């Protein structure tokens, strides 16, 4: 894992959870330009409301993010807001930075107040053990995740080597009260506030916003990007060459993390990747890709290894996009091969044995060629299994 | 079951399906004013496209509906349109009525052409056995439904006794390629075309449009109302006294049928009824009720008899409606009692034993009091079970 210059990480166990690490800090030696994308849920957790305010006031002066897992600090009213602010204050005290330079994040059960004594002890300890190793932080933000989710890459811009490192969590298949998706991207690129905002929005629309585990949007979802400028490149402005180079790097990180989130669910046995190609416009392409990947009927068909093309076409049809259904070609693809199952909106005869072989793989691509434009979109999801129902039916608040 | 004056029904087995009845006709002795609401899916089955055209051209002259089950005639291209039209022609020939007075409907597997020889034999036979008994028709439109779905009521308008009879099918839990929702309402009321259209739209918005079985919208869904005027009342005009009286009767029929559709699914063990009350506006009330009833996490919680209020609040939050989450009160209710689980958007302590007892019933009401307006909406759905996944994962195209 590459670590961008000037960032330090920590993850500790402060006993919000019984055994595993539950509190983490990211710290930058110098102030960062920061941008965030937050849950669209009307019911927003206290840290989400807190961070939106901080990023409005101080987008060029962020020095730290403090995150706890185990308790979401959502549906917690006024006391929740006081606790979110206290997390920032305590972190600022321990790190010797201004309060308004600290962002806060939580993930875990809804409707429970944070145990602030434990949280404050955790912050003290984490501030003492900051290091170049991002792994303890990645572990500390996990809830029901079974795997750590990190990805990094490097890119040359303006003769300078720039590093991008992303750390995420999210696992909707298991205890979905804890299904929050969190992602923290750090980079040593130098970039303007406007450019960073634009870049993050563009990338999120084609990564985290295109994954579906169970269709339910958490109260705590957030993606934060911190750029501390230590690579020493000329400040990147919107839609310049440097902008697109950094975009590619950040987007690689976000797409890899989004796929890792989809892959990681005990209930899931398969990953679906839906490609919508030759769509009339980008909005329709995205609507259709998301609709297919979110359909319970498509999810169960993939689980059952059934080349049920009618369900895919129907899901495209109710996506909300307007299009000519009589132009659609549909393919299923995997390591084992590729098969055409529909042409011009109608089924074609295909070898059931071959289809079965293709669908028996772990990663299935569903390719919908709309033949009515040039836009494309990709979405990722997983299958729907008895295990999902079992786990979510049994889970107790 | 009350039957409106002048309507006759038939249902026969013409071997599209192996054993059960698969072709039905509704016939009115005199021309009907007719209105229809059709699937919003962009991918529309041939009979849907055909009927939309007929109702545009001839809304005051409908005399019959012919319906087959077993094959949906969806994703069947030009041949599908030819076959839909041929069903109407054959029915018109056998009944001695104009072709443009016949509506067509299909439900069953997608992507397969109708076996027209069997269908035509079925139409011949059905036309011969028309009677006052609606039961054979109700049986003939079933696919994976385990129960016949009919409801009738009477209302006095203008000194005349008016009868409304509805016959429906729909069962998304089992073989969802056949999950089409069909509903045919017959009445002997005399009503203007404009009034009938308005009345149907109003009622559908608060009945069929508020049920969720698996979130997937069929290519074949349709609701048709036929009014033949034989009750002899003065023609009902929009928003008169008579209009609202007939609305109440039709709406009773539609709500009962909608609930029967939700109840009938082998995979389902419980029915949920979501009441959103004191909402800021009707659109928000409906969005929120539908969002809750469609949430996989709420569905599995109900299945698991878990008073997981956080999932309900979160589903309200991502519904797309804008509201103040800090005003929400939430209750679970059933035959066994009623319990408050959240107040002003936050959890309240409640007796877990009592909650368990309430949620162990077959019919669960979730009541969300928004305390920010006067509008209400109801939605119906069922739980999500391992059985649903098992059935849909195994089902083969």
Swiss-Prot record, chains A, B:
Keyword Transferase: yes
CDD domains reported for this sequence: OAT
Residues at which substrate binds: 143, 169, 180, 266, 392, 397
Signal peptide: none
Residues annotated as site: Involved in the stabilization of negative charge on the oxyanion by the formation of the oxyanion hole: 107-108
Site (Cleavage): residue numbering on this chain: 179-180
Pfam family name, one: ArgJ
InterPro entries: Arg_biosynth_ArgJ (IPR002813), ArgJ-like_dom_sf (IPR016117), ArgJ_beta_C (IPR042195)
One of the GO BP terms on file: ornithine biosynthetic process
GO-annotated cellular components: cytoplasm
EC number: 2.3.1.35, 2.3.1.1
Keywords: Acyltransferase, Amino-acid biosynthesis, Arginine biosynthesis, Autocatalytic cleavage, Cytoplasm, Multifunctional enzyme, Transferase
SUPFAM superfamilies: DmpA/ArgJ-like
UniProt-annotated catalytic positions: 180 (nucleophile)
Subcellular location, principal: cytoplasm
Gene Ontology MF: a single term: glutamate N-acetyltransferase activity
Taxonomy, superkingdom: Bacteria
Catalytic activity: N(2)-acetyl-L-ornithine + L-glutamate = N-acetyl-L-glutamate + L-ornithine; L-glutamate + acetyl-CoA = N-acetyl-L-glutamate + CoA + H(+)
Compartment list: Cytoplasm
Pathway membership: Amino-acid biosynthesis; L-arginine biosynthesis; L-ornithine and N-acetyl-L-glutamate from L-glutamate and N(2)-acetyl-L-ornithine (cyclic): step 1/1; Amino-acid biosynthesis; L-arginine biosynthesis; N(2)-acetyl-L-ornithine from L-glutamate: step 1/4
HAMAP family, per the entry: ArgJ
Subunit-level organization: Heterotetramer of two alpha and two beta chains.
Family per similarity comment: Belongs to the ArgJ family.
Function: Catalyzes two activities which are involved in the cyclic version of arginine biosynthesis: the synthesis of N-acetylglutamate from glutamate and acetyl-CoA as the acetyl donor, and of ornithine by transacetylation between N(2)-acetylornithine and glutamate.
Name assigned to this protein: Arginine biosynthesis bifunctional protein ArgJ
Biological source species: Thermotoga maritima (strain ATCC 43589 / DSM 3109 / JCM 10099 / NBRC 100826 / MSB8)
């Amino acid at each position: 894992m590459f670590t961008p210059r000037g960032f330090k990480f920590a993850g500790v166990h402060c006993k919000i959870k019984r055994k595993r690490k539950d509190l983490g800090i990211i710290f930058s030696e110098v102030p960062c330009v920061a941008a965030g994308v937050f849950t669209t849920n009307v019911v927003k957790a206290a840290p989400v409301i807190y961070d939106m305010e901080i990023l409005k006031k101080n987008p060029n002066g962020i020095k730290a993010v403090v995150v706890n897992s185990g308790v979401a600090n959502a549906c917690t009213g006024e006391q929740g807001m006081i606790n979110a602010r206290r997390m920032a204050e305590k972190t600022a005290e321990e790190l010797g930075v201004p309060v308004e330079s600290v962002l806060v994040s939580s993930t875990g059960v809804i409707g429970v107040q944070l145990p602030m004594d434990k949280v404050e002890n955790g912050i003290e300890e984490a501030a003492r053990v900051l290091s170049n190793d991002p792994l303890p932080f990645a572990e500390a933000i996990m809830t029901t995740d079974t795997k750590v989710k990190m990805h990094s890459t490097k890119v040359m811009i303006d003769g300078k080597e720039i590093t991008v490192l992303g750390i995420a969590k999210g696992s909707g298949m298991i205890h979905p009260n804890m299904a929050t998706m969190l992602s923290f991207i750090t980079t040593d690129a130098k970039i303007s506030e406007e450019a960073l905002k634009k870049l993050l929005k563009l990338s999120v629309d084609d990564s985290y916003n295109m994954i579906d585990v169970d269709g339910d949007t958490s109260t705590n979802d957030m993606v934060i990007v911190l750029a501390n400028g230590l690579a020493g490149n000329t400040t990147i402005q919107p839609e310049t060459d440097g902008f697109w180079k950094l975009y590619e790097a950040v987007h690689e990180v976000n797409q890899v993390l989004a796929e890792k989130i989809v892959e990681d669910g005990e209930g899931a046995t398969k990953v679906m990747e839906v490609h919508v190609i030759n769509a009339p416009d980008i909005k329709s392409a995205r609507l259709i890709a998301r609709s297919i990947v979110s359909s319970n009927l498509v999810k169960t068909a993939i689980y059952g290894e059934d080349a049920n093309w009618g369900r895919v076409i129907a899901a495209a049809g109710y996506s909300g996009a307007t299009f000519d259904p009589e132009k659609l070609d549909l393919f299923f693809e995997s390591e084992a091969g590729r098969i055409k199952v529909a042409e011009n909106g109608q089924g074609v005869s295909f070898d059931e044995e071959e289809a079965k072989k293709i669908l028996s793989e772990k990663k299935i691509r569903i390719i919908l060629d709309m033949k009515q434009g040039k836009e494309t979109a990709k979405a990722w999801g997983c299958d729907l299994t008895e295990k999902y129902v079992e786990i979510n039916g049994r889970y107790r608040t």
